Swiss-Prot record:
Residues making up the signal peptide according to the UniProt record: none
Main location: mitochondrion
Protein name: Cytochrome b
Topology with respect to the bilayer: Multi-pass membrane protein
Intracellular or extracellular location(s): Mitochondrion inner membrane
One GO cellular component, as annotated: respiratory chain complex III
Binding site for a ubiquinone: 201
Requisite cofactors: heme b
Description of how the protein assembles with itself and partners: The cytochrome bc1 complex contains 11 subunits: 3 respiratory subunits (MT-CYB, CYC1 and UQCRFS1), 2 core proteins (UQCRC1 and UQCRC2) and 6 low-molecular weight proteins (UQCRH/QCR6, UQCRB/QCR7, UQCRQ/QCR8, UQCR10/QCR9, UQCR11/QCR10 and a cleavage product of UQCRFS1). This cytochrome bc1 complex then forms a dimer.
Gene (name only): MT-CYB
The organism of origin for this protein: Megaloglossus woermanni (African long-tongued fruit bat)
Keywords linked to the UniProt accession: Electron transport, Heme, Iron, Membrane, Metal-binding, Mitochondrion, Mitochondrion inner membrane, Respiratory chain, Transmembrane, Transmembrane helix, Transport, Ubiquinone
Binding site for heme b b566: 97, 196
Length: 379
C-alpha cells in the first residue's frame, strides 16, 4: 500500500514541497532565509490579526487604541512589539535573501526572480501602510510626504494623490483605507509566496557553486528541515531579544506623539528599512526624477538577468565580482545611514555620490568586470 503522504491529493502537495523535495546537497545557511521569511509572514499575520481585534482605524481613536492595546489588553504589549520588530526581522531576512540571490546568480530563474520582486514591492507597500496606522507624528507626516510623491506624475498626479487620500489631505478616509489594505495585502503576499515556490520547484534550487546539481540531490526532510529549525531558533532569539529588551530601538520617538497636522517634526524619515531608497529619492533635486530613482532603485533588480555577462553563474569563483558585490553592500549601508540624516552638508553630497555609485555598480561596473573575468579565464 502506498504511503498516504504520497497518495492523498492534499498531503501529496505538502510532501512534494517540504518532505520528499530533492534539494542540492551543498546549499549553505544563505538558503535558510526563504523559510525564515515564511515564518516571519506567519508571525506578522497572526500578531496582526490579534492587534486588529483591538485597533480602531479612526483618526480620533487610533492612537488611543494602540495605547490601550499596550496598557490594557492581556499581553497586548508583546503582540504590538512582536509585530513592529517582526517587520524589521522580515526586512533583514528579505535583504539577505535578495543579496544571496544576487551573489549566487539565482536571478537566472527568471519567473521565480520576477515574482520575488513583486513580493518585495508588496511587502514594502504593506510595511509603509502599517507604519501609518498608529497615527503618531511620523505616521501622519510619513504618509503625507510619501503619498505626495505621486503628485509628480504628469497630468494625473494631483488627482491620483487626492483619490488615494480620499480628500484634500491625509485624514480619516486615508487611515481607514490604509488599514483595509494593510489587512488585505499579507494574504495576497501569501498567495504570491505559493507562486514563488511553484516556479522554484519547477527548476529546483540553485547552489553556491552555480553548477547544476541534478546528479547530487538529497531529500529536504530531514536534512534541511532540521537546518531550517536551527535558523528559526536563531531568528527567534534575535527577535525576542529585541522585543523584550529594547522594543523601541528601531522605532522613531516622534511616533509616541499623537499626529498633529499643524506641527511638522524636525526630521521626517521612514522606518530604517526604507532609508536607503529614501536617500536615493532625496539625492535628486527634481521631484519627478527623485520618484523615478526611488522606483528604479528596486526595479533595477528586474534587469539583473539581462545584465549577467559572466560565463559563470555564481560569484563563488569570481573574486573581482565579489569585491564589487561587497562594495554594493557597503554602499547600501552608507545610503541607509544618509537616509536618516538631515538634509545638510556634507550629507547631501555623500548621498548623491552613494546613489550614483549604486546605479553605476549594478548597471555598468558589475557587467563590465564580468567580461574582464571571462577574458582573464580565456573563456
Amino acid at each position: 500500500m502506498t504511503n498516504i503522504r504520497k497518495s492523498h491529493p492534499l498531503f501529496k502537495i505538502i510532501n512534494d514541497s517540504l518532505i520528499d523535495l530533492p534539494a542540492p546537497s551543498s546549499i549553505s545557511s544563505w538558503w535558510n532565509f526563504g523559510s525564515l521569511l515564511g515564518i516571519c509572514l506567519g508571525i506578522q499575520i497572526l500578531t496582526g490579526l490579534f492587534l486588529a481585534m483591538h485597533y480602531t482605524s479612526d483618526t480620533a481613536t487610533a492612537f488611543q487604541s494602540v495605547t490601550h492595546i499596550c496598557r490594557d489588553v492581556n499581553y497586548g504589549w508583546i503582540l504590538r512589539y512582536l509585530h513592529a520588530n517582526g517587520a524589521s526581522m522580515f526586512f533583514i531576512c528579505l535583504f539577505l535573501h535578495v543579496g544571496r540571490g544576487l551573489y549566487y546568480g539565482s536571478y537566472t530563474f527568471m519567473e521565480t526572480w520576477n515574482v520575488g520582486i513583486l513580493l518585495l514591492f508588496a511587502v514594502m507597500a504593506t510595511a509603509f501602510m502599517g507604519y501609518v496606522l498608529p497615527w503618531g507624528q511620523m505616521s501622519f507626516w510619513g504618509a503625507t510626504v510619501i503619498t505626495n510623491l505621486l503628485s509628480a506624475i504628469p497630468y494625473i498626479g494631483t488627482d491620483l494623490v487626492e483619490w488615494i487620500w480620499g480628500g484634500f489631505s491625509v485624514d480619516k478616509a486615508t487611515l481607514t483605507r490604509f488599514f483595509a489594505f494593510h489587512f488585505l495585502l499579507p494574504f495576497i503576499i501569501a498567495a504570491l509566496v505559493m507562486v514563488h515556490l511553484l516556479f522554484l520547484h519547477e527548476t529546483g534550487s540553485n547552489n553556491p557553486t552555480g553548477i547544476p546539481s541534478n546528479m547530487d540531490m538529497i531529500p529536504f526532510h530531514p536534512y534541511y528541515t532540521i537546518k531550517d529549525v536551527l535558523g528559526a531558533l536563531a531568528m527567534a532569539l534575535v527577535l525576542l531579544t529585541l522585543v523584550l529588551f529594547s522594543p523601541d530601538l528601531l522605532g522613531d520617538p516622534d511616533n509616541y506623539t499623537p499626529a498633529n497636522p499643524l506641527s511638522t517634526p524636525p526630521h521626517i524619515k521612514p522606518e530604517w528599512y526604507f532609508l536607503f531608497a529614501y536617500a536615493i529619492l532625496r539625492s535628486i533635486p527634481n521631484k519627478l526624477g527623485g520618484v523615478l530613482a526611488l522606483v528604479l532603485s528596486i526595479l533595477v533588480l528586474a534587469l539583473m538577468p539581462l545584465l549577467h555577462t559572466s560565463k559563470q553563474r555564481s560569484m563563488m569563483f569570481r573574486p573581482l565580482s565579489q569585491c564589487l558585490f561587497w562594495l554594493l553592500v557597503a554602499d547600501l549601508l552608507t545610503l541607509t545611514w544618509i537616509g536618516g540624516q538631515p538634509v545638510e552638508h556634507p550629507f547631501i553630497i555623500i548621498g548623491q555620490l552613494a546613489s550614483i555609485l549604486y546605479f553605476s555598480l549594478i548597471l555598468v561596473l558589475m557587467p563590465l568586470i564580468s567580461i574582464v573575468e571571462n577574458h582573464l579565464l580565456k573563456w
